[in-house]
Amino acid sequence: MPTCSRLIALDTETTGLYPQCGDRLISIGCVEILTNGEPGASYHQLINPQRPVSAGAQRVHGYSWEMLKSQPRFVDIADDFLNFVEGATLVIHNARFDIGFLNAELAIVNRGCMADYCEGVIDTLSLARQKPPGKPASLDALCKAFNIDASGRTLHGAFIDSMLLVQVYNSLTKLP
């Protein structure tokens, strides 16, 4: 595990599952993980995806196109987001999904990819599948397994999920 890099728990919400088919980000949530494991500075932004939200995605996170159309576009928030995460190691649950969407958004605005800005990525889904192997590894299952209070979370949300991820990461990295 990195010790010299700043750690940031990150989660996203999207219009659907496939950035290669035009699905877009609708929310980014980031929470710094301090050296004592506590949450630090945070960044959260709703985003106008410039397209409708699929019914399936809306059931997951509760955001509709009507709720998002007045939010800034990714191009408008890219600098603030990248400044927040620059030089950090990102802690992401199912990193392939989130990094795929972030890279797709960065490509649209000609800003390279996440690897250009961040030191690395720790995928807590991969960690969870190793410790102990064979057990459910969803964020919900890990919160339950580690007795993390997720009662304030009725739907997925990038910010609340990144806050829960701080606790899940701390629990996973304390396991032998």
Set out the residue ranges of the language-model regions.
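Active-site phosphate/pyrophosphate-handling residues
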Residues: 100, 125, 163
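Non-catalytic, well-ordered alpha-helical segments in soluble enzyme domains
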Residues: 144-147, 166-171
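Acidic two-metal-ion nuclease catalytic site recognized across multiple nuclease folds
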Residues: 1-2, 168-176
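Conserved non-catalytic scaffold segment of RNase H-like nuclease domains
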Residues: 1-118, 129, 133, 137, ...
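Acidic, divalent-metal-coordinating active-site segment for phosphoryl/phosphodiester hydrolysis
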Residues: 157-169
